[in-house]
């Protein structure tokens, strides 16, 4: 049975983890956020978040975006390939509803999961 937890092993934790993703990465983007992915040598995908204060001004907005990104990742982690993902928020992300964000996340997760994406 699959577990849908989002524990420590599913997160990018150190600056080195993030730097590895930014080198030779594949991107899937929208006007609201970008997801960058790179293959890892682990048996599971990992997620990192970058939500700049310059893009989403309020802490409530940043926390909402991060919460929805984690939840979307948590629900789709078993369909995702073994890659490290970094989600980078853009200013217009705060204008979307929760439902619109989830749909957009699903679309971009699917795009990055295709075999032709490295």
Swiss-Prot record:
Catalytic activity: Endonucleolytic cleavage of RNA, removing 5'-extranucleotides from tRNA precursor
UniProt entry keywords in alphabetical sequence: Endonuclease, Hydrolase, Nuclease, RNA-binding, tRNA processing
InterPro entries membership: Ribosomal_Su5_D2-typ_SF (IPR020568), Ribsml_uS5_D2-typ_fold_subgr (IPR014721), RNase_P (IPR000100), RNase_P_CS (IPR020539)
Any Pfam family the entry gives: Ribonuclease_P
Keyword tRNA processing appears in the UniProt entry: yes
Top-level taxon in the UniProt lineage: Bacteria
The protein's enzyme class: hydrolase
GO biological process, one term: tRNA 5'-leader removal
GO-annotated molecular function: 3'-tRNA processing endoribonuclease activity; ribonuclease P activity; tRNA binding
Xref: NCBIfam families: rnpA
Similarity comment: Belongs to the RnpA family.
Complexes and interactors: Consists of a catalytic RNA component (M1 or rnpB) and a protein subunit.
HAMAP family: RNase_P
Function recorded in the entry: RNaseP catalyzes the removal of the 5'-leader sequence from pre-tRNA to produce the mature 5'-terminus. It can also cleave other RNA substrates such as 4.5S RNA. The protein component plays an auxiliary but essential role in vivo by binding to the 5'-leader sequence and broadening the substrate specificity of the ribozyme.
Stated name of the protein: Ribonuclease P protein component
The organism's taxonomic lineage, starting at the top: Bacteria, Pseudomonadati, Pseudomonadota, Gammaproteobacteria, Vibrionales
């Amino acid at each position: 049975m699959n577990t849908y937890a989002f524990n420590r092993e599913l997160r990018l934790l150190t600056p080195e983890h993030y730097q590895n993703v930014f080198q030779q990465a594949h991107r899937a983007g929208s006007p609201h956020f970008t997801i960058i992915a790179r293959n890892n040598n682990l048996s599971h995908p990992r997620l990192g978040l970058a939500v700049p204060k310059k893009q989403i001004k309020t802490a409530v907005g940043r926390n909402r975006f991060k919460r929805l990104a984690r939840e979307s990742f948590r629900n789709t982690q078993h369909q995702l390939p073994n890659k490290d993902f970094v989600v980078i928020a853009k200013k217009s992300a705060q204008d979307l509803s929760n439902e619109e964000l989830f749909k957009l996340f699903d679309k971009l997760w699917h795009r990055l999961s295709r075999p032709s994406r490295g």
